[in-house]
Regions:
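Beta-strand-rich modules
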Residues: 731-752
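Structural signature of tandem-repeat unit edges
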Residues: 25-35, 44-57, 66-85, 89-113, ...
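Pro/Thr/Ser/Gly-rich low-complexity, intrinsically disordered linker/stalk tracts
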Residues: 679-705, 749-763
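Short beta-strand elements bearing conserved aromatic residues within extracellular beta-rich modules
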Residues: 709-711
Length: 763
């Protein structure tokens, strides 16, 4: 009877606790912070935002990242709400538009100023109308309004603030009123749909990066009052073709038109005093560049990767031009060769210095360096993809080469050094030191067979890029040996240089190091690699390289086509074995493969790889990196792999795996699809160990889903217990220093499917 009497009170108590906990949880998620001056500076919580009576100011980033649908101001003497937006009490200041506002928005005619970030992150707004009463907009007004297409600005607006429309990726056009005198930095940065811009003549100042990354901007008109094109103003406007009204510009700052790859013409003013560093870098379609008489300074790389011809006014005291090339005033330094000039580039006589990037990226078929030039560096020819030959003068004393300078120019097949040069000579199109000891410059487009001179001692990585079919050297050479068209060290133990056009390769008996092949693998053409039966360090099977006993797969050939199944004798795979396997389409990892927990299988640039299947076996953890595997569509994992670490998976990949492992999470991370192959048992609960005389008793809670349990260490199985009802077993004292693991298993398709293990330390 007493139980029935107090039951309603008990239920009321439980309900009160539940409501209290729920309220506490909600309160824990909400933040409402007001400082001692009355500024609301931090908020998170309900999308309906109450502006309490103690709030007299709103911080500029108070609602950053917060979803808001409307503001309420009941009882507040400083603010009011109109249609859910927040205003000052007198209605002259628009403070905040709710971030979830959709469609169009019209600012009331009472508003004179729009506050900092007022519309920032209103990602659903499509159009805004600003009345003529507004004269001031603060920074970041419309930043990141991704769907905003149209904005009508006030005719009395005096300036456009910093980042005002930055990230408005749908904004197609905008009319800037003639009342505007300045536009601040990044005002239209990353407006990727903006197609044209016309600056009224009232504008005298436009800040840096104002239109940078407007990748669809095709046409721009500058204001007549502008005297400078600011830093990075049109940087990366890749579709920009014309810039109008430039005749009054006195300064073009650095990066101003960088990467405007379709910019065809630019009118250079008589008033133009300076052109900044990289101002026209990579303006690939820029035609004739005319340097007027008043231009005093041209910065580093100003026209690198640009122009088809340079013309310098004859009265310019600082620069000159000859044969379409830009030179210093005395004609001694080549500042820039026009990259769009095709055919033979014959650098004028009198030039004794060549700027570091004067030639890079040029379309020339040959380059002749004039007498008088004494110093050059190999990377000065970087990107000259049409280049077939280079002619060096007898005056050349120094040719600088740093590690990594090797050029991969597929057409370059001839280097010629003028007779009489005391420092270098050329033979069969290759440049050597005068004593023949060093390869100085090997033309990477050279094809066929090549024989290294007997005197040569060092090649470094100068032959890293080649298109040779074979490389040989005299048997009398003290420094190198050659077998089967491959160059080795004098003892034949390691590869020094490999002919990149070679389709197959046999590793000789003496070779014990193939690291060179790994370094150049991305450029190899080999479909298969065999190994001499006398080699003690390597073996091969089906054209794939293993260690001598076939336990470790070391190297999969770049051009080996189709699917591949790892032999069952293989226990390990080198982390980079499948890097740059360009023709591999599918891979099966067999049951005996095991791997250190902290090792990763790399499949970088396996461009045709579509699927990988891992068989049930030794692996319980797998780490893979799929950089450049854009066609990968399917991964299949067994129940034994509990944890996966999958990096750079392409979006949309399908993973076939087991529930209660991490396969599903991996698929979700890649925005892909998870296909369940079943569910592994849950972790055993209640596991505990106690000592009983000379042995230990392990106990656990029974699991109804289990078909049995396995008790084991890292080295061996202790017990294999059948039946879900088993809840304990004894462990011999010899395992007293070991970590003990227990896991449940169930039978599916006549095979054991193990769950995750629970570990316990006996000691």
């Amino acid at each position: 009877m007493k139980t029935k009497k107090y039951a309603p009170l008990f239920l009321l108590f439980l309900l009160t606790c539940l409501l209290f906990n729920t309220a506490s949880a909600d309160a824990a998620k909400s933040v409402y912070r007001v400082d001692r001056f009355g500024e609301l500076y931090d908020y998170s919580g309900s999308p309906v935002v109450p502006i309490r009576s103690n709030v007299s100011a709103i911080g500029p980033y108070t609602f950053y990242g917060v979803k808001t649908t409307r503001f309420t101001t009941a009882g507040n003497p400083y603010f009011k709400s109109i249609n859910g937006a927040l205003y000052s009490k007198d209605g002259t200041l628009l403070i905040k538009c709710p971030s979830e506002k959709t469609g169009s928005f019209t600012v009331p005619s009472s508003v004179k100023k729009i506050a900092h970030s007022a519309f920032m992150d209103c990602t659903k707004l499509t159009s805004v109308t600003i009345p003529d009463s507004v004269t001031v907009m603060d920074d970041r007004t419309f930043k990141n309004c991704a769907l905003l297409k149209r904005v009508r600005l006030s005719r009395y607006l005096t300036s456009i603030p910093s980042e005002a429309f930055s990230g408005c990726s749908s904004l197609t056009d905008i009319t800037i009123p003639s009342s505007v005198s300045s536009i601040s930095s990044k005002a239209f940065y990353n407006c990727q749909s903006l197609r044209s811009i016309s600056l009224p003549d009232s504008v005298s100042k436009v800040g840096s990066s104002c239109f940078a990354n407007c990748i669809n901007l095709k046409k721009a008109r500058l204001s007549s009052k502008m005297d400078a094109v600011e830093y990075s103003l049109f940087n990366n406007c890749t579709e920009l073709k014309t810039v109008e009204n430039t005749g009054h510009i006195e300064e073009i700052e650095g990066n101003a038109f960088r990467n405007c790859i379709h910019l065809k013409t630019f009118s250079y003013s008589n008033k133009l005093d300076s052109i900044g560093s990289a101002a026209f870098l990579n303006c690939l379609e820029l035609g004739t560049v005319t340097i007027m008489k008043g231009t005093r300074d041209i910065g580093y790389n100003a026209f690198n990767g640009a122009a088809s011809k340079f013309i310098v006014d004859s009265s310019n005291p600082n620069y000159s031009s000859r044969n379409g090339m830009l030179l210093n005033e005395k004609g001694e330094t080549l500042i820039q060769a026009p990259i769009n000039m095709s055919g033979d580039l014959d650098i004028p006589k009198g030039v004794v210095r060549i700027a570091s990037n004067a030639l890079t990226g040029g379309h020339f078929s040959s380059i002749t360096i004039p007498e008088g030039v004494t110093w050059m560096r190999m990377n000065q020819f970087q990107g000259c993809d049409n280049l077939k030959s280079i002619h060096f003068p007898a005056s050349l004393k120094t040719f600088v080469y740093y590690s990594g300078d090797a050029l991969n120019l597929k057409h370059l097949d001839r280097i010629v050094v003028a007779k009489g040069n005391p420092n270098f000579y050329s033979q069969d199109g290759v440049m050597y030191s005068s004593d023949g000891v060093y390869v100085i410059f090997f033309p990477s487009g050279k094809t066929g067979a090549f024989r290294l001179p007997q005197t040569c001692k060092t090649i470094g990585d100068r032959m890293r890029y080649n298109r040779l079919s074979s490389i040989s050297v005299s048997s009398k050479s003290k420094y190198f040996s050659s077998t089967g068209g491959v160059l080795y060290d004098s003892k034949g133990k390691q590869i020094v240089c490999f002919p990149m056009s070679k389709r197959s390769y046999r590793i000789p008996a003496g070779v014990k190091n193939i690291n060179y092949l790994k370094r150049v693998k991305e450029d190899l053409k080999c479909k298969a690699i065999k190994v001499s039966s006398k080699n003690k360090w390597f073996s091969s099977k089906a054209g794939v390289v293993f260690d001598s006993d076939e336990e470790t797969l070391i190297f999969y050939p770049t051009k080996k086509k189709g699917s591949y199944k790892i032999p069952t004798s293989t226990q390990y795979i080198a982390g980079d074995a499948f890097d740059d396997a360009h023709e591999l389409t599918s891979l099966t990892i067999t049951k005996n493969v095991k791997r250190s927990r902290f090792s990763t299988f790399y499949f970088r640039d396996c461009k045709k790889l579509k699927s990988i299947s891992v068989n049930q076996g030794e692996l319980n953890y797998i780490s893979m990196n799929f950089t450049g595997c854009d066609k990968l569509a399917k991964l299949t994992f067994p129940s034994t792999i509990m944890t996966t670490n999958l990096k750079n998976l392409p979006t949309g990949v399908t993973i076939h795996g087991w529930k209660n492992t991490y396969a599903k999470e991996a698929a979700e991370d890649a925005q892909g699809k998870f296909v369940s192959r079943g569910t592994i048992p849950n972790v055993v609960t209640g596991a505990r160990i106690k000592k009983i005389i000379d042995k230990y008793q392990l106990s656990w809670n029974a699991s109804s889903e289990a078909s049995g349990y396995q008790v084991y260490t890292s080295y061996s199985t202790i017990k294999d217990l059948k039946g879900s009802g088993s809840t304990s077993c004894f462990i011999p004292e010899k395992y007293s220093e070991s970590t003990i693991y227990i896991r449940a298993y169930k039978i599916e398709n006549k095979k054991k499917v193990y769950g995750k293990a629970r570990s316990l330390d006996i000691g």
